[in-house]
């Protein structure tokens, strides 16, 4: 591609130089003609009458142009052919392109119509174009050499031509000529068979209609008979069903009575039925663990001081249940011989409120230390006094 571009550039430069030389020669000749009025008259004073046809005018102009060029010794830049004649008639002229090559453009023909004389003075644009300087080539147009005139595709006609319809490769296999096209059904044996079946279906449809009528009549008779029998059966069954609800009502009353007996309250035995509580208070219970000797919380609930209803029949006890599940968390008997030292009021820390009651008891042959925390000191003293009252008499009263 680069070599082709360079060749085209060289050709354009050479053609440009040749055209510049020719234009300079024509300038010199025109300057000479200005000094010779006889030559100017012979070159330009050709007049053509209006009655002549257009073809004669074109031929006359071409002849005059050739004579003037021969007399002056100037070679025409473009050979006059039949195409140039047509261009003159269509007011076209050749001009110089930016790439330095000759393109076919419109010939500028100055037609000055003189209304008084009624003729047309034709001056070829060849002389004017020769006098004009050549157009300068732009240094930035690198693709100027690829003009329409110098293009290898310039010979190809760009005239609007209707695109030819491409014949399909499957044209031979058209539906009319295809081996797979079905033959007409007119002459086929299938048509006769179809016609015969149609006649049979028509005759068969008539028989089916008659059978349908008979079956419908039979169905109506059966329906009437069955409906009468069913009505009689319903009457008999209705009389029997009237007596059944009475028996059902009796059974339902018995069942309701039995359910009432099942929902009766049941008594829960707690072991406190023969006891009465002389004092109760809400408290939180702590116990000393055997292994680590630290206080451990057992839970909170209501602490009761219970004594037997019949005094002297038994001993009292301290009973406490957990609020959540009512599990017994303290059940300490008050035996005879308990001293006051086993019940001591204390505080959790020095300077704090004395709202704890420490109780030292024996359970299952082991000594256990409890601590009951109440709201304030007054409740702790009341609890201690009631516990001392519940201890059976005959015990030691040590201070």
UniProtKB/Swiss-Prot annotation:
Xref: SUPFAM superfamilies: PH domain-like (SSF50729)
Main localization (coarse): nucleus
Comp. bias (Polar residues): 253-263
Protein name: Brefeldin A resistance protein
Species for this entry: Schizosaccharomyces pombe (strain 972 / ATCC 24843)
Occurrences of domain RanBD1 (ranges): 256-396
PANTHER family given in the database record: RAN BINDING PROTEIN, RAN-BINDING PROTEIN 3B-RELATED
Record localization: Nucleus
Region of interest: Disordered: 1-173, 191-269
Record PTM text: Phosphorylated.
Biased composition (Low complexity): 138-157
GO biological process, one term: protein export from nucleus
Any one Gene Ontology molecular-function term assigned to this protein's record: small GTPase binding
Keywords: Nucleus, Phosphoprotein
């Amino acid at each position: 591609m680069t070599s082709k571009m360079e060749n085209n550039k060289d050709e354009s430069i050479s053609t440009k130089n040749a055209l510049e030389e020719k234009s300079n020669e024509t300038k010199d000749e025109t300057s000479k003609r200005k000094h010779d009025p006889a030559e100017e008259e012979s070159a330009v004073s050709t007049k053509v009458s209006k009655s002549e046809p257009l073809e004669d005018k074109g031929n006359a102009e071409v002849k005059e142009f050739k004579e003037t060029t021969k007399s002056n010794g100037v070679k025409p830049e473009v050979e006059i052919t039949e195409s140039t004649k047509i261009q003159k008639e269509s007011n076209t002229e050749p001009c110089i392109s930016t790439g330095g090559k000759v393109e076919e453009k419109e010939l500028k023909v100055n037609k000055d119509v003189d209304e008084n004389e009624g003729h047309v003075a034709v001056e070829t644009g060849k002389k004017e174009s020769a006098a004009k300087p050549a157009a300068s080539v732009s240094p930035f147009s690198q693709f100027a050499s690829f003009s329409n005139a110098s293009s290898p595709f310039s010979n190809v006609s760009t005239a609007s031509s209707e695109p030819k319809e491409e014949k399909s490769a499957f044209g031979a296999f058209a539906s009319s000529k295809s081996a797979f096209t079905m033959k007409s059904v007119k002459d086929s044996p299938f048509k006769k068979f179809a016609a015969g079946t149609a006649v049979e279906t028509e005759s068969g449809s008539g028989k089916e209609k008659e059978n349908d009528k008979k079956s419908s009549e039979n169905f109506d008779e059966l329906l009437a008979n069955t409906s009468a029998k069913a009505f009689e059966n319903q009457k008999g069954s209705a009389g029997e069903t009237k007596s059944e609800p009475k028996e059902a009502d009796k059974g339902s009353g018995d069942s309701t009575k039995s359910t009432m007996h099942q929902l009766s309250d049941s008594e829960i035995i707690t072991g406190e039925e023969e006891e009465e509580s002389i004092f109760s208070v809400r408290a939180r219970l702590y116990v000393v663990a055997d292994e680590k000797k630290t206080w451990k919380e057992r839970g909170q609930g209501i602490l009761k001081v219970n004594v037997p209803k019949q005094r002297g029949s038994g001993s009292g006890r301290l009973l406490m249940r957990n609020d959540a599940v009512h599990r017994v968390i303290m059940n300490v008997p008050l035996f005879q011989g308990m001293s006051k030292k086993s019940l001591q009021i204390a505080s959790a820390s020095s300077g704090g409120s004395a709202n704890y009651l420490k109780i030292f008891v024996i359970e299952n042959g082991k000594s256990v230390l409890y601590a009951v925390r109440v709201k304030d000191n007054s409740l702790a003293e009341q609890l201690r006094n009631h516990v001392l009252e519940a201890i059976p008499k005959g015990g030691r009263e040590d201070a």
